[in-house]
Amino acid sequence: MTEQFDPSAFLSTCSGRPGVYRMFDSDARLLYVGKAKNLKNRLSSYFRKTGQAPKTAALVARIAQIETTITANETEALLLEQTLIKEWRPPYNILLRDDKSYPYVFLSDGDFPRFSIHRGAKKQKGKYFGPYPSAGAIRESLSLLQKTFMVRQCEDSYYKNRTRPCLQYQIKRCKAPCVGLVEPEVYAEDVRHSVMFLEGRSNALTDELSTAMEAAASTLDFEKAAELRDQISLLRRVQDQQSMEGGTGDVDVVAAFVNPGGACVHLISVRGGRVLGSKNFFPQVGIEEDVAEVMSAFLGQYFVSSPERDLPSELIVNVVHEDFPTLIAAIDELRGRELTISHRVRGTRARWQQLAVTNAEQALSARLANRQHVAARFEALAEVLNLDEPPQRLECYDISHSSGEATVASCVVFGPEGPLKSDYRRYNIEGVTAGDDYAAMHQALTRRFSKLKDGEGKLPDILLVDGGKGQLSMARDVLNELAVPDLILLGVAKGATRKAGFETLYLNDAAHEFTLKGDSPALHLIQQIRDEAHRFAITGHRARRGKTRRTSTLEGVAGVGPKRRRDLLKHFGGLQELSRASIDEIAKAPGISKKLAELIYANLHSE
């Protein structure tokens, strides 16, 4: 603890009631948030002279101030603790990295509604199903609905402006309601069947379709009978894949696993006896590395901090924690629903539990192995470059454009544990000659390292540039102009064969040219980072180019600003459909007069 903090004086005035405590460092940064049944007893445990875990000792050494909030009971303390953790994300708490809202399947309103993925507030008029553990789980369900019932999933703006069926109709994934090729009542029946599937009533749906198939066959409507037969076959195949033997209710199976270096929580979501999907979580491990602490922290953040998430009737867990009764009470207070947490289970439920444990163990092992793999490559690179120790931060830059159009520079960052995606950056390049990669790189590096000079960001140990001597020399010029401290510059250029494994490398002033063997771990690291920079630049360039092409044609029209351009494109479903529209059709768009429609039409057909 710091010199200004006196634990004895603090504890002498500390309450013995339930509450929440907050620990701060000398710069008033929040380090840790905790709750306690008895604040004085809990806080006293931090200042014992023996028996402290290393991470707890590291936390205590930084404490300069402790604040407490007394609560009426433990439940209130847990609710306040979770609120503070979610808001401040203290570095010594166990934190869920992925705290995004879970996705739902959304069924829109109207005569021919669409199914889509939805996140966030439920403001749109329609019906919501879920939440699902991941967007991937939703895509699987939507794909099945397309194959089985051929319900539409296109955007409304696209749907409203179709004049002929799209490719989805040709491959039997949609019945083309956009051009009237299906009756409303037939489509409504397909939607009703889709809803039955999403609600977990697959058995009732299969029985209903079987009855309809027999009726169609008895009236010699063999085409309809064959269609129903195919639907039943698809549904039964999915039922076999997704069913949990012996399961009929709503259950989340949660397993936590901790190893030196990390933790993993695996969640399997079962609704109506059907597996909606599963997901791995890798919480940031704080001062507590006990598996029960990880489980308790996960359940608190997952269900208490995010009350919009779907709550099953039961949780099956692989470890128990003394806070579970308080957690159940907090959930009951928030949701008005009772939750059962089961640990000692038998039969099928025990197999579910073991499956979750196995997945958590394997996922964490794979993650740690990948970290070790990347770390070994960093060590190999240090050996190749004759460094005293492996670099901790490597930045790579690349440029992407289409004949000089929509030029974008990318910056990706890697450390010994892998990519640091929160530090990735893209730079939209402006004011340079089209296709001048040197000028584009100069601008990107200048913008990046000017911020560093102003005290923003971190200095990399190695700067990797995708290019040869010219790009490397230009990078050196930028660093000299900005008086950036010495750092290692590494250029990577395609070799004479332009094949992977034959790259030519240039170090610092480009005078040092060398190659590495194709099986060199150091070369593999360079290739990995270069390819990631290339991918990141291309995706940014394509997005920028697409946006430019969608709007640039309308930018010269007086009276059509950014908002009106967006509204026009949304109304017609894109620039191509707008180009096909007549003056009268354009004038029917919201906010467009006949005179403005004439200007827009003339601009679109000026060539």
Curated annotation (Swiss-Prot):
Example of a GO biological process term: SOS response
Domain GIY-YIG, first and last residues per copy: 16-94
Entry's localization field: Cytoplasm
Keywords: Cytoplasm, DNA damage, DNA excision, DNA repair, Excision nuclease, SOS response
Family per similarity comment: Belongs to the UvrC family.
Functional description taken from the UniProt entry: The UvrABC repair system catalyzes the recognition and processing of DNA lesions. UvrC both incises the 5' and 3' sides of the lesion. The N-terminal half is responsible for the 3' incision and the C-terminal half is responsible for the 5' incision.
Protein name: UvrABC system protein C
Organism listed in the record: Pseudomonas fluorescens (strain ATCC BAA-477 / NRRL B-23932 / Pf-5)
Name of the gene encoding the protein in the UniProt record: uvrC
